[in-house]
Amino acid sequence: KKGIGEGSIRTCFCTGVLPVTMDDLTSGYNIAEILTLEPEFLNMLGFTYEEAGAYLRYVLDKYTEGQDRFNEIWQLNNYDGYRFRPGAEPLFNSTILTYFFKKFAVRKGGIPRELVDENLRTDIGWIRRLTLSLENAKEMLDALVINDELPYNVPDLSSKFNKKKFFDKTFYPVSLFYLGMTTLRNNYRMVLPNLTMRSIYMDYYNEMNHIEGGPPRYVPTHEPFTEDRRFEPLVQNYFEQYLGQFPAQVFDKINENFIRCSFFELCSRYLSSYYTFAIEQNNSAGRSDFEMTGIPGTDYYKDDRLVEFKYFKAKEAEHMLALNAPRPEDVAQVLAYA
């Protein structure tokens, strides 16, 4: 403050700090302004689609034989989706996109075995500290992995806030937003931005709810798939070994979104060396629930799978279980996606 008053300091920019930190930093004077969410500064927070495309072309030119594989490598659903203002252009997370390109370059054009930088995974204890109780943590995770959204207030995004408010239950969405864990769907709701964060949050959910994820449950099914390519055992294994661990009362709130996310997390855990994944993928006929596509340069290239999950009420169970073939309308829906 003294330096600005004397004229020795004209402007001081602070980057990479949370508003809660800024509140402490500027508590002695009231001449600080948060510029993060101003339209002119939004693109500083990540890569635009144009910038990410140029970045990929540079990496392809420098570390591979050229740009012929551009469309194959251009996987948008793992690293993009960050929107820092309602209606703003979605951005790529610069940290995890650079992680992918770095691994891609080291492998001389090979797809990294791990698509998620482990440094992004927050210790589950930290989530508990933010929410202050196990009950609050479970409630927050339910909202994100089951309901796929968290309501928020737009004015809270641009306000300075202190440590007490940061840990307030009603402020969780904004706290997660500034930690890079959620993004804006619209003026009212936040969501997980991409498959990377969905995978991380499903992992949190499983750990917090004591869902066993050990290899003995899943490897005996996923390993044979890499040879025989039989998809049905993967689905059966998911329902028996994963969903079979949940108590009956949990199924009162489980929905299609949870099924999509948890099935994706399980498959990607064991098959990410061979396939890339997408959920709620836009197609000419609508949005498919789940898709897995063989990675270019592997034996699985052009081996594509598409799944459409259907939710039925308990009273319909007997009729559905009696069927010995898919319903014609469901087959037609999947064929339209293909």
What residues fall within each predicted segment?
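Short alpha-helical segments and helix-capping/turn motifs at coil-helix boundaries
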Residues: K2-G5, N77-R83, F167-V174, Y178-L179
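Substrate-engagement module of ASCE P-loop NTPases
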Residues: K1-R10, Y337
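Amphipathic alpha-helical transducer elements in NTP-driven molecular machines
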Residues: Y49, G53, P328-V334
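Structural recognition of the conserved hydrophobic beta-strand(s) that form the central parallel beta-sheet
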Residues: R10-V17
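Amphipathic alpha-helical segments of the small helical/lid subdomains adjacent to P-loop NTPase cores
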Residues: T21-S27, L35-K102
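Extended alpha-helical interface modules used as scaffolds for assembling large macromolecular complexes
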Residues: A32-E33, P90-R327, V331, A338
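A generic structural signal for well-ordered alpha-helical segments enriched in polar/charged residues
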Residues: K2, A54, Y58-K62, E265, ...
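Short, surface-exposed basic-aromatic patches at helix termini and helix-loop junctions that form
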Residues: G5, N30-I34
